[in-house]
Amino acid sequence: MADQTTLSPALLDYARSVALREDGLLRELHDMTAQLPGGRAMQIMPEEAQFLGLLIRLVGARRVLEIGTFTGYSTLCMARALPAGGRIVTCDISDKWPGIGAPFWQRAGVDGLIDLRIGDAARTLAELRERDGDGAFDLVFVDADKAGYLHYYEQALALVRPGGLVAIDNTLFFGRVADPAADDPDTVAVRTLNDLLRDDERVDIALLTVADGITLARRRE
C-alpha cells in the first residue's frame, strides 16, 4: 500500500534515491493511480513491486499468478521480470481498475504476457485448478480483499509448485493487527491468516516489514 511504511520520510527518500528503479512509465501509472479515490491506500508501494520482480528472477518463475490486479502496477513490474516464454495470470473482481493499467502494459510491450481474468477470485482460482491442475505456478502474489485471504492462501498453496513461493501483501495491515482493540473483519482476517502461517508446517515463511508487510511462504517439497 502506498506510503505505508515505518521509515521516516527522510530515510524513505534516501532508500528510494539509492535503490528504486522506477522508470517514467511506471511513475506515470503510479501517479495516475494515486489520483483515484482510495488509490494511495490501495496501490502497492513501488519498492515492493520492484521486490516482486526480483523474486521472480530469484525463483526463476515462468508461471506467475496474481490475485488482485487493481490498476496493474505490480502486474507490470512482474511481467517485465518474466523470462522468455513466461506468463502471468492476474485476476480482479472488475475490469474498472485493470482497464487503467492495460494501456501501460501495451506501451511496455508486455501485454501479450498477461492473462487478465475478470470475476470472483474464488471462482477463477477453482477454474485454474480444474484447467491446469495443482502445482501449475512458480509464484503466487496475493493482494485482494482481506476477507478472502484464508481461502486465497489455501488455493494459492495448492496452485504453486513444491519449492514455489506464495507472497502475501498487507500482513501488517496498517499496524492494526497488533492492536487488540481492532476487531473489524478485515483486521481479524489478516490476523487469523498470520496465526495460521506461523504454525503451517507445509511452508517455510518470513514476514518482511516492507511497506505494509509482505509474508513469503515457500511451499515445502
From Swiss-Prot:
Function noted in UniProt: 4-O-methyltransferase for the lactone ring of midecamycin and other macrolide antibiotics.
GO MF annotation terms: metal ion binding; O-methyltransferase activity; S-adenosylmethionine-dependent methyltransferase activity
Keyword tags: Antibiotic biosynthesis, Metal-binding, Methyltransferase, S-adenosyl-L-methionine, Transferase
Top-level division of the source organism's lineage: Bacteria
Gene (UniProt): mdmC
GO process annotations (BP): antibiotic biosynthetic process; methylation
SUPFAM superfamilies: S-adenosyl-L-methionine-dependent methyltransferases
Enzyme nomenclature, EC number: 2.1.1.-
Family membership noted in the UniProt record: Belongs to the class I-like SAM-binding methyltransferase superfamily. Cation-dependent O-methyltransferase family.
Protein name: O-methyltransferase MdmC
Residues holding S-adenosyl-L-methionine: 44, 66, 68-69, 74, 92-93, 121, 145
Enzyme class: transferase
Matching InterPro entries: Cation-dep_OMT, SAM-dependent_MTases_sf, SAM_O-MeTrfase
